[in-house]
Amino acid sequence: MGDTWAQLPWPGPPHSALLLVFFLLAAGVMHSDAGASCPVLCTCRNQVVDCSNQRLFSVPPDLPMDTRNLSLAHNRIAAVPPGYLTCYMELRVLDLRNNSLMELPPGLFLHAKRLAHLDLSYNNLSHVPADMFREAHGLVHIDLSHNPWLRRVHPQAFQGLVHLRDLDLSYGGLAFLSLEALEGLPGLVTLQIGGNPWVCGCTMEPLLKWLRNRIQRCTADSQLAECRGPPEVEGAPLFSLTEESFKACHLTLTLDDYLFIAFVGFVVSIASVATNFLLGITANCCHRWSKANEEEEI
């Protein structure tokens, strides 16, 4: 019997087997911790955390550290606390659509350097500040559509987003968009701007020229982009405007115009002097007449 056991092959040094068991247990504990940290009312699987359609009023705490895809869509979330994404450096997709967000805290994406897709549509955002996407240089897609109170986009709101390909600003409250906000987006392919109350005055001309120059690379929803003002172009498609539409913005004065203005100014000056002279004479006469009446009464 002893000889039989002696002839059996030994699987290896005891310390190697112990190390193998240790690593397996450690991996199991780590996996168990990641699964155990799934928030209540959420489902967690394959680095995807789905907390959508749960009527949440606040963001869930303590997500799995390796979360790559986080959906908080279709809830009633009104605010995201500062530093909420600090620990989730693997985050690639963040879906916050259809909530009650009015603003986002500064530096929210400071540590989300791998974030590529961000959906903030169907919220109540009123403006996009300069520091909103700071450090989130990996963003490829941003959806800000259907924010009816969105009135202003800071000229440097998208600064540094060199990889951004898709930007949706449709169906908001934008009447004006600074050209500077788009010029720093070399990779932009799709831009949606329809459904906004655009004021197609002189300030719109630079943006329209830029869009026309980029139209083969930047596909804008030209059929939905309409002017809400001034009255003479109200209801006109934005891309139907031509250089003639902005002719009044480039009026130049000729020599005859300057001579006419000078003549009118001269006439007005003479009329003013004559009027002052007549008023002076009238006042003097009234004074003398009043003084004469006083002497007669005495």
UniProtKB/Swiss-Prot annotation:
Classify the main location. Answer: membrane
Which N-terminal residues, if any, form the signal peptide?
1-34
- Among the Pfam families in the record, one is LRR_8
Domain LRRNT stretches: 35-65
PROSITE patterns attached here?
LRR
Q: Where in the cell is it found?
A: Cell membrane
Which residue numbers delimit the LRRCT domain? 196-251
Q: List the disulfide bonds.
A: 38-44, 42-51, 200-227, 202-249
Membrane topology per record: Single-pass membrane protein
Q: Where are the LRR repeats?
A: 66-87, 90-111, 114-135, 138-160, 163-186
The lineage, from the top, is: Eukaryota, Metazoa, Chordata, Craniata, Vertebrata
Q: Transmembrane stretches, by residue range?
A: 259-279
Q: Which domain of life is it from?
A: Eukaryota
- Known function: Auxiliary protein of the large-conductance, voltage and calcium-activated potassium channel (BK alpha). Modulates gating properties by producing a marked shift in the BK channel's voltage dependence of activation in the hyperpolarizing direction, and in the absence of calcium.
Q: Kindly give the Gene3D superfamilies that the UniProt entry links to this protein.
A: Ribonuclease Inhibitor (3.80.10.10)
One GO BP: potassium ion transmembrane transport
Q: What is this protein called?
A: Leucine-rich repeat-containing protein 55
Q: Name one GO molecular function term.
A: potassium channel activator activity
Known partners and oligomeric status = Interacts with KCNMA1.
